[in-house]
Each structure stands twice: as C-alpha cells, then as structure tokens.
C-alpha cells in the first residue's frame, strides 16, 4: 500500500461487503480476493481466510475478525412485521427508525419501527424499546414476507462508507473490517 487512496479503496470494498455475524461469507470472500494478490490464500473449515508468506525470518500472526453487528429474524407476525434478536453487540438505544437490509431469499430494505412522539406516553419519552418490542417493517403482508424471509435470516444496518474531515472515514462495519 503506497498511499491513502489505495488503503481507502480497500477499506471501502471490505466495508461494503455483506457479513453480519454468523453469515460473513461475503466479507470473507472480498478479503480473500484482495489478500490473494499478495500471497497464497485458503479458507479453513470454519470459513476463516488464511494466507501465509514463505520466508526465513521471524513468524508473526495478523488476526482480525470480519463480522458486522446486526440482527437475526426470529419470527414474522400476523401483520408482516419481522421480529428480531441481537446478532452481535447491537445497541437497542440507537435502533429506532434505523434503515436495514434483510438478507433473505433476496435483499429487502426495511425500517425498524418506532413509536411517533404524538402516540408515545409521557412515561415512555426518551426510553428505548426492549428487543422483544421492536420489529422491522418491510412493507409486506405476512404471506408475501414468508416467501422471502425466514427465521435465522440476517439483518444488516444500512449505512454508507462516509468520508469525514481530513483522511477519516466511517462505516457501520469499520470496527471489524479495518483490522483486516
């Protein structure tokens, strides 16, 4: 890597790959393709990306994880809303109205439901819902949702790879992918 632009392009590609905890193949495949430009690469039985360089010097290990926190579908209710559980370290306090992608039989965009301020009770003001109270609205009735989504499907938080001031960047998956 000779410059910021090259590092940024690699990081943007890694951060753009699918890889919610437990379903990291998209991100692992992207990492393997990029690593293969520099060394022989193989995948372990558990899906880890491994590469090594031959040499006579000291041995070092570079180790990182590649998953992204997200959610996992647990059920589809009678109105077509998806019930979910944490998949990784999802923080309930920041989920209200978040845009998400459900990785079912095809990718489906949705939004995490929230109670509008004019419908919330004064005692609920400023409080996050419990995980068993949140749902994802994918704009489908139950029958249509059941054709595309199943319990166990992963849900990723949408967010773009964002250039910030100077040479800084941000992405929902940057905490894990930057180490790769």
Positions of the model-derived regions?
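N-terminal hydrophobic/helix-forming segments and targeting peptides
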Residues: 1-180
């Amino acid at each position: 890597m000779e410059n910021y632009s090259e590092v940024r392009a690699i990081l943007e590609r890694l951060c753009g790959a699918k890889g919610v905890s437990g379903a990291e193949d998209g991100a692992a495949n992207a990492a393997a393709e990029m690593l293969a430009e520099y060394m022989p690469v193989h995948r372990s039985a558990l899906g880890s990306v491994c590469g090594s360089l031959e040499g006579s010097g000291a041995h070092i290990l570079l180790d990182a994880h590649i998953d992204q926190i997200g959610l996992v579908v647990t059920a589809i209710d009678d109105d077509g809303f998806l019930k979910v559980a944490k998949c990784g370290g999802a923080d309930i306090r920041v989920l209200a109205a978040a845009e998400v992608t459900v990785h079912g039989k095809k990718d489906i965009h949705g939004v995490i439901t929230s109670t509008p301020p004019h419908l919330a009770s004064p005692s609920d003001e400023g409080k996050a819902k419990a995980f068993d109270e949140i749902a994802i609205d994918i704009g489908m009735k139950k029958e249509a949702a059941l054709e595309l989504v199943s319990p166990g499907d992963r849900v990723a938080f949408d967010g773009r790879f964002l250039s910030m001031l100077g040479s800084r960047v941000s992405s929902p998956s940057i905490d894990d992918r930057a180490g790769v």
